[in-house]
Design a protein with these regions (language model features):
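Residue-level recognition of tetratricopeptide repeat
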Residues: 77, 111, 143-146
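Structural marker of alpha-solenoid helical repeat scaffolds
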Residues: 73, 107, 138-141
């Protein structure tokens, strides 16, 4: 009988300590500034679709600040530059948006997101030939970005962003 209690005690002790090992209250999950910015941009897009432009712009402004920090920490990252271009464009600064997009393309010329968004910027600024150049780069990707930019250039669809 003593052996059974001893064995149960050992099993109980091992089980409790193994649960404790994976559930420390000191566990800290950190989200990067880039990830926070992407989340804010997604919320901004939703607000924009609902016509809540002021709320959308506040999210874009917050995202922009986080992306600038990310860019300082990790310069030459095409994804960060893509979102920097996107947020500045959404906030009405097409010149800065174009600058960020072009910096991103210098790093990764085939970046699908940058090519699409830069094409949309060119359409918005009435530079259709440059938009068509971006479309040509996307031609072989077999992706939604190509189809969307083509429709925007053709005038059959309005840019959602």
């Amino acid at each position: 009988m003593k052996k059974i209690f001893f064995i149960l005690f050992i099993i109980f002790s091992i089980t409790n300590s193994s649960y404790a090992a994976g559930s420390s209250s000191n566990t800290k999950t950190t989200t990067s500034n880039y990830d926070k910015a992407v989340k804010l941009i997604k919320f901004a897009k939703k607000y924009e679709k609902k016509g809540k432009i002021d709320k959308a712009n506040k999210r874009y402004e917050k995202a922009l600040k986080l992306l600038l920090k990310s860019n300082k920490k990790k310069p030459n990252n095409a994804d960060i530059l893509n979102y920097l271009g996107f947020t500045t464009r959404k906030l009405g600064d097409f010149k800065k948006g174009e600058k960020y997009y072009l910096e991103g393309l210098a790093i990764e010329p085939g970046h699908i997101g940058i090519n699409e968004y830069l094409g949309e910027l060119y359409v918005a600024t009435n530079r259709m030939e440059l938009a068509k150049e971006r479309l040509e780069i996307l031609k072989g990707c077999n992706c939604d970005e190509y189809k969307e930019l083509k429709e925007i250039i053709d005038g059959t669809k309005k840019s959602k962003y």
